[in-house]
């Protein structure tokens, strides 16, 4: 999309979650529903879909990583502080800095998290989701369309993943395998945080994210992934 990078970026923020969420709903109704939402078969089926999508992307766009320009990217020096003779003093050690776009991504993640929490706690859709997750048979007895709820949840989850991909592409690069590392970390976060526990998942995500970033910078990204995977077995 021509013009300012912000135009294409804003369009992707809207189109990508809707498109991916819609495809996820279709996949749920045509594939996952047929295997009766069995956990093991669902994992195998969705991983198979992932490989198909990766190969289609490879054949369409090729193996080259493509940089994406962020809509804004001003650099900001990160200050530190100490208590000196004149009280609290700020200084800028080690040349640490970040960008306005990375700060915006952090803010967007917080906003999405708050939105998901509000939806789960204060909307009818969230009530249906929690009821279905707590007791599927009881939800069916009360007339809740469980399969439709499953499809909606799968679509929302896929849409949020697409939103995260749009936000992260300007920081990294667009590549047909760009989802591999986030997929591994998401499994680890969910297992450590606890299935169905939003606070536990958030806490696990913060811990894993910070440790992964620090270890990747000072040691190696591979070591960071190994240590994160080992945490699952503890």
Q: Where are the regions a protein language model picked out?
A:
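Alpha-helical transmembrane segments within multi-pass membrane transporters and channels
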Residues: 2-49, 56, 203-208, 212
């Amino acid at each position: 999309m021509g013009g300012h990078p912000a135009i294409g970026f804003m369009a992707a923020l809207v189109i990508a979650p809707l498109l991916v969420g819609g495809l996820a709903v279709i996949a749920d109704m045509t594939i996952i529903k047929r295997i009766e939402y069995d956990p093991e078969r669902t994992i195998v089926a969705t991983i198979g879909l992932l490989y198909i999508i990766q190969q289609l992307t490879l054949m369409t766009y090729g193996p080259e990583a493509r940089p994406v320009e962020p809509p804004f990217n001003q650099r900001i020096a990160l200050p530190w502080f100490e208590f000196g003779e004149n009280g609290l003093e700020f200084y800028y050690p080690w040349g640490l800095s970040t960008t306005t776009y990375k700060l915006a991504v952090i803010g967007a993640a917080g906003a999405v998290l708050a939105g998901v929490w509000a939806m789960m706690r204060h909307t009818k859709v969230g009530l249906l989701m929690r009821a279905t997750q707590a007791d599927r048979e009881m939800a069916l007895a009360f007339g809740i369309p469980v399969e439709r709820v499953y499809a909606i949840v799968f679509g929302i989850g896929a849409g949020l993943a697409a939103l995260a991909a749009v936000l992260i592409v300007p920081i990294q690069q667009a590549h047909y395998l760009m989802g591999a590392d986030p997929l591994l970390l998401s499994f680890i976060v969910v297992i450590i945080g606890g299935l169905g526990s939003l606070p536990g998942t958030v806490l696990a995500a913060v811990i894993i994210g910070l440790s992964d970033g620090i270890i990747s910078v000072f040691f190696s990204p591979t070591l960071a992934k190994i240590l994160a995977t080992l945490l699952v077995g503890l």
